[in-house]
Amino acid sequence: MSTDPTQHLSNQPGVPNLTPCMNAEQVVQLLHNRYTAKKYNPTMRVSEEDFAAIIEAGRMSPSSMGFEPWHFVRINNRDLINEMLPYMWGAAGKLEDASHVVALLGRNVDQMKPYSSYLTHIHEDIQKYPHEALDARMGRCVTFINEDHNLQTDSEKNLWVDKQVYLALGNMLTMSAAMGIDSTPIEGFQKRSLEKLLTERGVYDPEEFHLTVFVCFGYSDAEHRMKTRRPTSEVLTVID
């Protein structure tokens, strides 16, 4: 009898082969080695192939009900980046020299309402559910948001969306580390001022999206502090 726990999946339509490409020790070592870069070497660039893999890691990330409420904006325009800097205290010394700068956006409340054009598109065009199943699917969405998670205000619902965006961010950070590329997630910015600048510059439509977080990718040009984390005993509780 096979000891491969994923063998039973290989013949199921639509289910990928889950053969591991890294062992547990390799993955743990990767996570131990990953760190947030504080300064970048402006002469070293991430290849387009590697950047595409990072974006693919974000695209393939899980999301609640499979709604994928994110959008990624790659900002190449250096003039715009310079305009952004006064509003991004957490990006000083990073944004200027990083190879790639990405804004991660979340979809606004109206986009995430049952029967919105976006959720209908996800249901029918992306997830390939039949149109007849739309009512049941949207009804489940209402129950999930309003009752199961008791999300009543627009702010609460936007925060729920942002949680999904952070799942994509986490996968992008791990993918970049797996390829030896440094990264910096950035929350240190003046949200309202930066949203005003980006929407005025036509970076995104504020009726559709809101700004969630930034991330930079490149190659570090500085030493970094030793990584510190709490021990497992402080972060894990086991209930038998």
Summary of predicted features, one role per range:
Residues 1-240:
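Acidic, surface-exposed loops and disordered segments
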